[in-house]
């Protein structure tokens, strides 16, 4: 492959003794003009770390070069817009949401009709100033479902009285292939819906770096502050070919890998627009460039799922080849924003909590996955906390897994940013990380488990290729790591505890940027510090527990599961 693995050295790059071919040649790089696209403080000190706290208590960012370049022109992006209402906003208190429908458990029979009817009754009520309609409360006890519960309207909250075995337990008898216990939202195209007047315009920059928040376009006429826009990265044959990331041999095509990232315009200056959140994947003219257009998505919002235990069929087998005798997925979110899942435990399923297209600005917290079913080591089984589709700006925090395969996992072409914060996996049998096909902009912040890998998966599956780029492992503790650098992109690991290893598929790929290996860094949480920098200490208090602010909470996560 005709590129040079030359990266800018940023801080003390700690590597273990592996074959020399696994690691890049590091050299000082020249600053690039693209640095004008950033709004965050730049640390120009020689060998500066990727991210560090400055003397003023705010983060400073060193620029780095992507694989194949010697130009330090990219920045670790700000992930802090992830979560409900764009991060830093408390979820609505339970007491502030009126209970409209109350159901008691039945001794026997199918509870689906009456629960769905209660949801539908709340769905037609008038929304309040917050966009909320009210809650359906399922009293403590056991409920049975013959079909998938669905929430299709904004402002509906489905609430129980606890996620433990003595709380509100919903047992699903759905047995359709890929069946779900609870479906929230709906399907949506991976291409964001264009506005009536989209004002599509080409990006007028040779290179839009990772971390950029300003983009110059051919014409910004008609763009206004507050517009929702899609940044389209439109690769060409060169990008998937030998001069690029060399994945055409895995049956990747340019049209399949156009990726759309939604942002909000915060300023317009001539033909330069400022965005509310940074770019997660560089856009280069030589690899196809990109465009911008105004969007008008149709999604629901202000939906809450809380204080429940969702269960599949405990009789479903656990060995490879198990047939679909119970629901496959517990909960799936799509075409939904500014919503939440809190204090929910799932049990006896394959997949736990899953997003799909259109899931944005959602928080899933204090959630757990127990006693999985379906194939113990079989492919496409036991994905626990899964970002799929064009999901972006989602936060999963304080999550716990026991027995899954892929715990903190990303599907194909997920644009990000998305965050896992303060999460623990126990007994996971395979790796966490991006699973396939160029997902970008994921932060694994204080996760703990078995393996955490960002690598070229080559022909695995149906041609997984490069699984992910711009994946940040921050103060994580896993037994084994793989941190490879994709061509013309990068992956990072800072403060990791655990052994680094060559990739499973092509071990010869050069490593990404690894700093402070074996020694955790300050700040403890990148997400929370970025949030603090952007919105202040109260924003951090709004979205965390006191124990979380004091330090690591892994040891306490299992206690809240409600076994």
Feature annotation, model-predicted:
Residues 18-319, 492-563:
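Extracellular "leader-to-stem" segments immediately downstream of a signal peptide or signal-anchor
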Residues 137, 144, 150, 159, ...:
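Extracellular beta-strand solenoid repeats
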Residues 148-152, 165-194, 293-298, 317-320, ...:
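Glycine-rich beta-solenoid repeat tracts in large extracellular/virion proteins
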Residues 155, 227, 233-262, 266-267, 272, 301-312, 337-348, 359-374, ...:
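Right-handed parallel beta-helix
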Residues 275-299, 322-337, 353-370, 418-422, ...:
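A short, hydrophobic/aromatic-rich structural module that often spans a beta strand
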Residues 439-443, 448, 461-523:
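C-terminal, active-site-flanking charged/polar segments
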């Amino acid at each position: 492959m005709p590129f040079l693995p030359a990266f800018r050295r940023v801080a003390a790059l700690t590597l273990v003794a592996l074959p020399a071919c696994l690691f890049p040649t590091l050299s000082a790089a020249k600053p690039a003009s693209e640095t004008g696209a950033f709004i965050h403080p730049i640390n120009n000190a020689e060998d500066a770390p990727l991210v560090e706290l400055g003397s003023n208590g705010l983060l400073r960012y060193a620029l780095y070069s992507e694989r194949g370049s010697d130009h330090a022109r990219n920045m670790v992006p700000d992930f802090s817009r992830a979560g409900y209402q764009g991060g830093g906003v408390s979820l609505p208190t339970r007491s502030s949401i009126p209970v409209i429908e109350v159901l008691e458990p039945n001794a026997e029979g199918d509870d689906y009709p009456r629960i769905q009817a209660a949801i539908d009754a709340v769905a037609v009520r008038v929304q309040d100033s917050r966009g909320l309609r009210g809650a359906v409360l399922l009293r403590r006890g056991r409920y049975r479902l013959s079909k998938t519960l669905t929430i299709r309207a904004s402002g509906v909250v489905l609430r129980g009285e606890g996620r433990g075995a003595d709380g509100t337990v919903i047992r699903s008898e759905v047995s359709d292939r890929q069946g779900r216990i609870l479906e929230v939202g709906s399907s949506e195209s991976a291409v964001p819906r264009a506005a009536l007047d989209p004002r599509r315009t080409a990006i007028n920059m040779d290179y839009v770096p990772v971390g950029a928040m300003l983009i110059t376009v051919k014409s910004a006429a008609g763009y206004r502050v507050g517009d929702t826009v899609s940044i389209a990265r439109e690769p060409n044959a060169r990008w998937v070919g030998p001069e690029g990331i060399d994945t055409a041999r895995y049956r990747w095509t340019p049209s399949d890998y156009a990726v759309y990232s939604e942002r909000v315009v915060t300023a317009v200056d001539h033909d330069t627009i400022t965005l509310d959140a940074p770019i997660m994947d560089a856009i280069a003219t030589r690899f196809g460039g990109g465009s911008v257009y105004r969007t008008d998505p149709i999604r629901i919002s202000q939906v809450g799922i809380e204080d429940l235990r969702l269960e599949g069929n405990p009789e479903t087998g656990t060995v490879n080849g198990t047939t679909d005798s119970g629901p496959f997925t517990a909960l799936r979110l799509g075409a939904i924003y500014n919503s939440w899942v809190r204090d929910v435990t799932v049990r006896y399923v394959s997949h736990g909590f899953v997003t799909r297209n259109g899931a944005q600005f959602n928080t899933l917290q204090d959630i757990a996955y127990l006693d999985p079913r379906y194939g113990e080591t079989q492919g496409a089984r036991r994905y626990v906390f899964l970002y799929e589709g064009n999901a972006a700006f989602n936060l999963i925090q304080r999550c716990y897994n026991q027995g899954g395969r892929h715990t903190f996992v990303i599907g194909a072409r997920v644009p990000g940013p998305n965050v896992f914060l303060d999460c623990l996996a126990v007994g996971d049998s395979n790796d966490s990380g991006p699973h396939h096909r160029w997902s970008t902009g994921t932060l694994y912040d204080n996760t703990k488990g078995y393996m955490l890998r960002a690598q070229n998966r080559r022909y695995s599956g149906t041609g997984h290729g490069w699984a992910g780029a711009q994946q940040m492992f921050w103060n994580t503790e896993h037994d084994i790591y793989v941190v490879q650098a994709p061509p013309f992109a990068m992956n990072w690991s800072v403060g990791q505890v655990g052994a680094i290893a060559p990739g499973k598929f092509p071990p010869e790929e050069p490593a990404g940027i690894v700093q402070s290996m074996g020694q955790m860094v300050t700040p403890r949480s990148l997400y929370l510090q970025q949030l603090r920098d952007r919105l202040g200490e109260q924003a951090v208090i709004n979205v965390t527990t006191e124990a979380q602010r004091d330090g690591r909470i892994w040891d306490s996560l299992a206690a809240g599961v409600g076994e």
